Design a protein with these regions (language model features):
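Flexible, glycine-rich phosphate/dinucleotide-binding loops
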Residues: 19, 42, 135-136
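Short beta-strand segments
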Residues: 12-13, 37, 104-106, 128-130
Length: 142
């Protein structure tokens, strides 16, 4: 068990350039919501702050991480433990307003880690962003 109610957690995921960053920023502007801000890491993504699972870059980076079997963490992952769940929260808490009703963590790999995150934080919510494929064409792969 962690020191935060998992029902307060909202995870946003989606492939790079699918709109996760602007969506999470707009969501974080709601008075009852806090997103990770002023973290000093790329796009204020929680994946770069936490010490538990490998970052998307280690699995090929933008878009490519989704094809790496090792990046697909599920409810059977050996990384699941109360200590790891708390370690992830401890890494994110300094960048949230803990008085907010809902706490948003946005990282593209969340799109393939929902089952893992749900096991770590039962009752948490997930939002998946997607975009038309042609909008992404040529950006990361040219």
């Amino acid at each position: 068990m962690t020191d935060l109610d998992p029902a307060r957690l909202v995870f946003v995921g989606g492939l790079h350039r699918s709109g996760t960053t602007p969506f999470a920023k707009v969501l974080g502007e709601h008075p009852e919501v806090s997103g990770l801000v002023n973290t000093g890491v790329r796009e204020d993504e929680g994946q770069h702050l936490q010490p538990v699972y490998p970052k998307a870059k280690l699995h090929g980076g933008s878009g490519r991480f989704a094809y790496a079997p090792a990046a697909h963490l599920t409810e059977s992952s050996t990384l699941i433990s109360p200590a790891n769940a708390q370690a992830m929260l401890d890494a994110w808490k300094p960048y949230w307003d803990l008085e907010a009703s809902f706490l948003v963590e946005k990282s593209p790999p969340n799109i393939i880690m929902g089952r893992f995150l749900q096991e770590m934080y039962p009752g948490s919510a997930f939002i998946s962003c997607r975009n038309r494929p042609m909008m992404m064409f040529g950006g990361d792969f040219s």
